[in-house]
Amino acid sequence: MNREGAPGKSPEEMYIQQKVRVLLMLRKMGSNLTASEEEFLRTYAGVVNSQLSQLPPHSIDQGAEDVVMAFSRSETEDRRQ
């Protein structure tokens, strides 16, 4: 996760955004989230909705590492634009 931050966002906002993205990727890959993780996503439903469209598509054959790497690449490309 990028700890340098983004302009206009507090470290807490960045943490929430990153955690939402990771949990959504895990859910999309078929992982069962814990009750506290599901509650976190419900609590930050607005962030969840904005992040869903940003998740990279993945094949069921792709491993978790490949999906995370693809997501990291897309994040890097977004920041360069």
Swiss-Prot record:
Compartmental location: Cytoplasm; Nucleus
Biological-process GO terms, alphabetical: anterior/posterior pattern specification; branching involved in ureteric bud morphogenesis; negative regulation of canonical Wnt signaling pathway; negative regulation of mesenchymal cell proliferation; negative regulation of protein binding; negative regulation of protein-containing complex assembly; negative regulation of smooth muscle cell proliferation; negative regulation of transcription by RNA polymerase II
Gene Ontology MF, one: armadillo repeat domain binding
Pfam families (alphabetical): ICAT
Assigned keywords, A-Z: Cytoplasm, Nucleus, Phosphoprotein, Wnt signaling pathway
Record flagged with keyword Disulfide bond: no
GO cellular component, one term: beta-catenin-ICAT complex
Superkingdom assignment: Eukaryota
InterPro entries from the UniProt entry: ICAT_dom (IPR009428), ICAT_sf (IPR036911)
KW Nucleotide-binding (keyword) present: no
Post-translational modification Phosphoserine, affected residues: S59
Main location group: cytoplasm
Physiological role: Prevents the interaction between CTNNB1 and TCF family members, and acts as a negative regulator of the Wnt signaling pathway.
Quaternary structure (record): Binds CTNNB1.
Family stated for the protein in its record: Belongs to the CTNNBIP1 family.
The protein's name: Beta-catenin-interacting protein 1
Source organism per UniProt: Homo sapiens
Record gene name: CTNNBIP1
